[in-house]
Amino acid sequence: MAGTSDRAGKPRMPNAKPSMIVIPCLDEAGHIASVIDRVSSSAERLDMTILVVDGGSRDGTREIVGEMAVSNPRLHLLDNEKKIQSAAVNLAVEKLGGGFESLIRIDAHGDYPDDYCERLVEEADATGADAVVVAMETRGAGVFQRATAVAQNSRLGNGGSAHRLVSKGRWTDHGHHALIRVEPFRAVGGYDESFSHNEDAEFDYRLTEAGYRIWLTEKTHMVYYPRASVTSLFRQYLGYGRGRARNILKHRVVPKGRQMIPLLVAPAVAGTSLALLNWAALLPAGMWAALCLGYGGWIAIRQRDPHGPLAGFSAMVMHLAWSAGFWRELLAFRRRETRA
């Protein structure tokens, strides 16, 4: 394969198994059993351990995992007192990472092809990459969730993000985390546990700055099920915005072009409060709303998808929440700097 790393073809660590599967979770009773079932066959074929790292679930998730572990000796449950996903993966590597070449991170809220783990291991071996990331396709069940999936699969919702639109494998600086070699994971200090959101992008920045390489594969992908209500979607993207701001502030990097436009949304919406003084204050927010709803209508016509119009509204929720979260974190940082 063209463009492979100089790690390609190197022997494995002595006595180390290829990979361990790490599933961070919190209150995922509705999904955890199917996710474990999905990866169990691969775990058997590749001799992998499955670690469910639970952040204190109260909905029966732990009991489900415990019952499944009785008949599945590869399955283990770890307690994650810090609750967040970044801490969950770090804990898994701390406890068992020394016995494995790499970790495969699985989202409890997602779905995966039956050969997902095999393809990741093959790609890591073929390219010599230090991390393999995948494309993410979003699907939904209810009306709002389906509309959100349509939005997230479009440029309106993902801004043309590389790991949303993959036709050919290539080297990249970021993607949806799938496989990471344990050695480089430890070398850069693992995930920053001060990040409750966007820990993957922050990690990828440190990984690539340290000279490690990330391969975006087209050989497999994962399916993600978005939040099913306006409130939960807004809360999620508020966290994403704050995480992105923290990443930029920590590393003093300039936001990418596709991130600059959503940054204007919260100020534009806030500016509508000046409409009593001048009606022109409505124009920026009005143009943004018209663009989103119009794009949703275009999706409905072009793709013959009845969820298109509502997808425009879902995109508005995501844009506004992300922008508000970003500015909230930025202003909080300025206040902390002023006090210091």
Where are these regions (language model features)?
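A conserved acidic beta->alpha catalytic loop
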Residues: 54-63, 82, 110-113
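Glycine-rich, basic loop-to-helix element that forms the pyrophosphate-binding segment
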Residues: 79-98, 119
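Conserved donor NDP-sugar-binding/catalytic core segment of glycosyltransferases
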Residues: 114-146
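Catalytic donor/gating beta->alpha subdomain of glycosyltransferases that bind UDP-sugars
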Residues: 124, 192-255
